[in-house]
Amino acid sequence: MGLIAKCLNRMTKSASYIKKQNRFSPLLNYLAALLLSFTPAYCAEVQSSGADSTPRSGAPAQDLTGLSLEELYNLDVIQLNVIGGHTHPAGQIMFGYEFMFMDMGGHLSGTRDVSESEILKSFPSASTGMTVEEHMLEVMYAPTNELTLMAMLPIKHIEMDMVMHGGIHFTEHSEGIGDLQVLALYTLLGSVTKGHRLILNAGMSFPTGSIDEKNTIFGETFKLEYPMQLGSGTYDLRPGLTYLGESKKWAWGAQALTALRFGRNGSGYRLGKEYELTGWLGYAVTDWFAPSLRIKGRIWGNVHGADPNIDPTVDAEGDPHRQGGRRVDLLMGMNFFVPTGILKGTRVMMEAGLPVYENLDGPQLSTRWLFSAGVTYSF
């Protein structure tokens, strides 16, 4: 009970200090207090000088020339789902976990809304909604200041609600690991001490995700459509280029990525190529909190070839020529850092957004909104 009381007292003092120092919402104040309250350095300062004193975690941001190499790398205000969007100093290891969620509903053909009743005039069944959950496990290691190695393995859970003629509803689902990605991030120009870097992303994905997912509905077993499969079934190259910029309080950047697919998988097809461009801006309110704004554009192609076990006449999701599209998302994020104490090196990040433009080779399900949250620990 004594330990619990100490923790609660420490958190209350932290919240009291933070409330006086900024104009954030009460929820954000207490989130920040929770992070600060478990750092021994802050606790010692609170005990010695009271809640009104300024802890190190509230110190104003310094010029780049006054920061250590490790602190400079920590200025990268980048969401976890910007793949390969940050690097590490030599010898540092990072473990990360990220949760991603996408909710889909309504249909588009091009930019035109299409109703389910209109789809059912051409197909015996139509999708009514879809959710994609992804749990991403990440590890990064930097053998040198210029080179960072990265590996990512997703675990997916996908559900798609369907309706048939006569108003009969059913749900398809698939779950399991997706394709493993391995990347090398190499600094081509600049350095973290200068505040500008150009980084080469050299990546490859391996077909560890299943392309043979099946469901049994109303006593009949059938192979699930292309969006319900967990992997690509092919070895894909994932090259890219990332620019990172940092100043006293600001961080910004841009990234271009591609997924280049070759050959065909064991089911006789390959997914379309993907092209992605994203840019972001972050502001360090303190050295433990930084909001961010990001815009992301993505183009993906239709399926080449076809799986003979997926009937393209049953629903639009099974048609290889109705898989491509273009979308622009606007996303806002929050980034929390632990600068001192036993949890030093920990980051907690959240980001949410929605499409501002969508053009689909449909009819296809439209994206309603996206959310991601994650935590990383570097040492």
Language-model segments: what does each one mean?
Residues 83-92, 104-108, 129, 146, ...:
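Short loop/turn motifs that connect adjacent beta-strands in outer-membrane beta-barrel proteins
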Residues 79-84, 143-145, 185-193, 198, ...:
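Outer-membrane beta-barrel proteins
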Residues 85, 97, 137-141, 151, ...:
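Residues on the lipid-exposed face of transmembrane beta-strands in outer-membrane beta-barrel proteins
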Residues 154-266, 317-325, 357:
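Outer-membrane pore/translocation modules
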Residues 93-97, 149-151, 182, 196-202, ...:
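Transmembrane beta-strands of outer-membrane beta-barrel proteins
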Residues 91, 131-135, 174-180, 196, ...:
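Residues that define the transmembrane beta-barrel architecture of outer-membrane proteins
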Residues 43-120, 193-199, 208-213, 226:
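Outer-membrane beta-barrel biogenesis signature
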